[in-house]
Amino acid sequence: MKTIGLIPQRPPFVMVDDMEVISPEHCRTTLLIKDANLLCDETFFGESGVLEHIAQSAAAFIGDKSLREEGRIWPGYIGEIKNFNFLDSAKTGDVLTTEIRITTIFGDVTAIEAQTSVSSDADNQHPVANCVMKLFVDRSHA
């Protein structure tokens, strides 16, 4: 599924190509890293790009969940990023794959765990980052 309507970012700053909802608590997103990506330095896609990809993946998943359950997408914010482990960088031509799992929902706060891996081909996938995030959904703009 395309994510362009689920996140506030617009080209050229979209860092998620596709999303597959696996269950109400789990999704998988992908991003093909292209030369034109604003967060690429030459052919290098580093920590800031990977973290932005994770954040947009989480936002797309929460937006999709909100749309399915409430019929609309609410504005939201990242409330916390913790335990961010950056293990390796990626390069143009690689595909980032991120698994997002909701661990807790308490009112307007959703806690997620994210695991991101990179592959240059289907048989060569390795982890590049993981973290925990808390996202706040702002329903005050009803």
Segments (PLM) and residue ranges:
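Compact, glycine-rich, soluble single-domain proteins
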Residues: E42-F61, I78-G79
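Hydrophobic beta-strand-centered segment that forms part of the acyl-chain substrate-binding groove
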Residues: A60-E99, V132
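Conserved positions in beta-strands of structured domains
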Residues: D17-E20, L87, R101-T103
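Extracellular/lumenal ectodomain signal focusing on beta-strand-rich modules
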Residues: D18-V21, N83, N130
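Short aromatic-glycine motifs in intrinsically disordered, low-complexity regions
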Residues: M1-R10, R72
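Hydrophobic core residues within well-ordered beta-strands of beta-rich domains
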Residues: F13-M15, L96, T110
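HotDog/MaoC-like acyl-thioester-processing domains
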Residues: R28, A60, K91-T92, R101-A142
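Catalytic strand-loop segment that frames the active site of acyl-thioester-processing enzymes
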Residues: R10-G46
